[in-house]
Structure formats: C-alpha cells, structure tokens
Amino acid sequence: MYIISHPHAQENKQRCFVATAAITANQSFEIAAWRPRHNPWLIALTVTLATFMEVLDTSIANVALPHIAGSLGASSDESTWVLTSYLVSNAIILPISAWLATRMGRKRFYMSCVALFAASSFLCGLAPTLGMLIFCRVLQGAGGGGLQPSEQAILADTFSLSKRGMAFAVYGMAVVVAPAIGPTIGGWITDNYSWRWIFYINVPISLISLYLTHRLVEDPPYLKQEKERRKSIPVDYIGLGLVALGIGTLQLVLDKGQEADWFSSHWITVLLALSIILLVTWVIWEWRHEHPIVELKLLKKRNFATAMFFMFILGAVLYGTTVLIPQYLQLLMGYSAVSAGEALAGGGFIMMLMMPLSGFLVSKMDQRVLMSIGFATTAAALYYMTTHMTLGMDFRTAAMLRVYQVAGLAFIFVPSNMLSYVDVPPEKNNQISSMISFIRNIGGSIGIALLATFITRGTQQRQTYLSGHMNDGNPRFRQMIDGLTATLRSEGLSPSDATHKAYARVAALLSQQASTLAYTDVISALAVIVACLAPLCFIMKRPPKGLAAPSLH
C-alpha cells in the first residue's frame, strides 16, 4: 500500500501510462501508414481472380446436374447433393475464416484455400462416381469458403480510405456478377465440351492466382504480431464445434427443406431444431468466451451491426431473384436453361458498369445517401417487374427487367462494405470481412428457401381462388370452353374429346396464371421490404472527416 501511495510511485505510474498510450498511438499510426510494396491494383486483381472463380462455382454446376446424373448413373434427387455438399462446407468455413487467417497468417491461409480449391476441382473432374464427386465438392467448398472474406480483408489493408471504395467495387464485381453469368457459362461448357470441364477450368486459373499471390500479396505487420500473440492462446474447440455443426445443419435444412416439404419431413424438423439449439448455444458461449472463434461483440458497433443487416437483405434479394427469375422463365415460359441464363447475363454486365461508378461516388458524397438511393432504386425496379411479368413477355423484356432490378444493388454493396469498418480497429479487419461474407451468403440461402416456399404456397392459394370462378355458371368461363371446343372440333377431334381437351387447356392456363400471380406477389413483398430500408441507412455513422485512418476502419 505504501508503494502505491508513494509520490514517486504515482509519478512512475503516470509515466508508464503515458508511455503505453504513446506506444498504442504509434502502433495505430504504423498500421495506418503501412502499405504493400507492390501496386495495390495488381493485388486487387490477383485476389479478385480467385474470388470470382469461387463464386462462379456456386452457380455454374446448376445447369450441368442432368448431365452429371446421366453420366454417373444417379437420379435427379441424388445429383442435387453436388450443390448441397459444396454449400454446406462453404458455409461452415466462412464464419471461422478470420480465426484461421489470424492463426495461420492471412497470406498462407489464402494460398492454402486456393491450392485446396484447385486440387479438389481437378479431382471433381476426374470423379468416377457420384459419391466421390460429392466428397470432392465438400473439399472444394471448404477451400472456397476462405477466399471471399480473405480478399475483402486484404483490400481493406491494402488501400487507403480514399481508394477503398473503388477496391470494394472490384470485389463486388466478382461477388455479384459471377452468380449471374454462372449458369450461362456452365450451360455453354456442358453443351460444347463436357460437364467435367466446369471443374477443370478452375485449375489453370487457380495456379495463376497462386503464383501472383505468392509474388504480390503480403501480410501487414500488425497481422504478423497478432499471429505470434495467438500462438499462446488456447483454441476454443467448443466454439469451433458449435459453429461448424450449427451452420452445417442450418445450411442443409435450407437447401433440402423445400424439396422435403419442410415440417412434414421428420428429419428436416429434427435438423432445424438441432441447428437452432447449437447456434443459440454458440452465441452464448462465444459472447462470454475470452478468446472466441468469432468475435460477436463487434456487433456492438452500430455501423457493423447495420451493415450485417443490410448485407443479409442484399444476399436474399440478389441470390433469391437469381434463382427466381430463371425458374419463372423455364417453368412458365418454356425457356431452356441456357436461354434463361442469357436473360440474366445482362444484369451481370450492368453490374460491371455500376460497381466502379459506385466506387467513385462513395468518395464524393455521403455514403448513407448513396445507399438510400440504392435501396429506393432497387425497390422501384422490383415493383416495375411485377407490372411487366406476364406469360406473354418477350426475351428482351425479361432481360431488361433483370437489368433494372440489379442496377441499384451496386449503390448498396460498396458503401455498406465501407461503412462497416467505421470505429473498428484494423486488427479486426479479418473478423469484419468474414462475418460480412458469411451473413450475405446465409441471407442468400434463407432468401432462396423462403421465396421458393412462398411461391409454392402462393400458387396453391391463387389456384384455389381462381378455380372457384371456373364453373359452368360463369358466362366468361362457359364462353372460353365453347370457343376452345369449337376450335378443337375444327381440327378433327370428336365432340367429347374436344370438350375434355378444352377443359385440360383451361386448367393448364389457370395453373400458369396462378404461378405468375404468386411470383408477382413475392416480388411485390420484396419491393416493400427493400423500400423500408432506405431511411434506415441514416442510422449508420459517417466516417469522421480529417481523422487518421485507424479510427476510420
């Protein structure tokens, strides 16, 4: 007690405090001042190459499933595990990629992911059986899971604040454009070569990415220090197990739920309950743990929490409609898979133009205003879609509707990514990137599952409603049946056959109209949800002007 109260001891304590503060300030300055030795744009293109390839693989295999099933002697239901296995392993790696990058070193982790992705892609192409292909897809998903968050963290450290918007725009082009053109590329490769080449094509691109990453990418000093510090910290095996099992079972439920008719399936119900229990337990455990795998306490940061919410909605809208629109074109309008993919491709190309524009604007105007414009534009485009989605629309109309729908997404993606780093220390960049990528992908999975379910239920409800008006007591219905019967009789059918066929045609038309109304109902609901988000953008804080970069991360 005497030592603490001694005047000299107090003076020494104050000096230590000042010295510690000075060291912390110097470290923050060094973190902010650090820049890689090589051209940042070469680094951006290098890491974007692998990310584009990985995101492309989430959708490129969709159109090849019938060919894969036929080649390997599998049923259509069995072949869907080629997609599910990839998505499940990918979803498990995403939230823990920040922890892995910190323990291994981000560059080493990133290169390991690219190498695993390349090797497993080659093995996918060689797979002699469906079981082997599914196993290789699990490895491929695990390798791909670390690429998106690692790239975003690398870009955040590589670029100064003033240029980060354009860097995130480059990243956005990979994440947003790849799913849009994946089905088209997959269909073209499958039709002209073989389904195996949708996997082989990854190998040379991965090797180029590996070489360029080795030569150009480097870990910042703070990350090297964090890696050394982590060596003495015990691994949170319980948190690791909980998140892996919880996310894995949730992704499995989302991917197979609609196919199994959700809660009418016992195994889906059990898996969903298990995933909820595991994830709730994981959140409680991680929140209290001193050294968690995923630092959930970052959600106390207003900007980051808001960005997570926005990215969840963005994922649901982007990936949900990427599945929804081709489905509508194929099932109701008779498009082939390739033609449906081509209708979406225009949206991908417009995103390639809008992303750089958004990257330029974030440094010129209030990012919150830009996001608000993005939400308002997207909501208006979704509503516009509902007024033009008919069974008689042509290919040009379908393609332009997709262009309108995605044009505003760039104004959401880039500024929300930028603002998510406000008030977050640089050493947490890996965590921010990992959680943003994870929530966007989970939003996509949940969006796809919910939209598909609502369309199925909505079609049934609309069909029941319309059927109530289809009876012989309705003059218009009677007139339609009589007209069709007369037309069919003129083609040589007997009166009874013509009548039966007329009723069958009306029933088919009723089913198509019910489905169309269900699609427009779902898209209208999306438009309302997105429109409500426009004013919420102003919850986020702007980056303070004139402050050093560390406080802006």
Language-model segments: which ranges?
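Cytosolic juxtamembrane N-terminal segment immediately preceding the first transmembrane helix
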Residues: 2-50, 54
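Hydrophobic transmembrane architecture of multi-pass small-molecule transporters
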Residues: 20, 26, 78, 441-532, ...
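Transmembrane core module of solute transporters
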Residues: 38-102, 110-113, 125, 131-134, ...
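Helix-loop-helix hairpins in multi-pass membrane proteins, especially solute transporters
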Residues: 94-240, 349
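Small-residue-rich alpha-helical segments with characteristic i,i+4
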Residues: 168, 180-183, 187, 321, ...
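Central mid-sequence intracellular linker of multi-pass
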Residues: 203-248, 267-270, 294-300, 460-494, ...
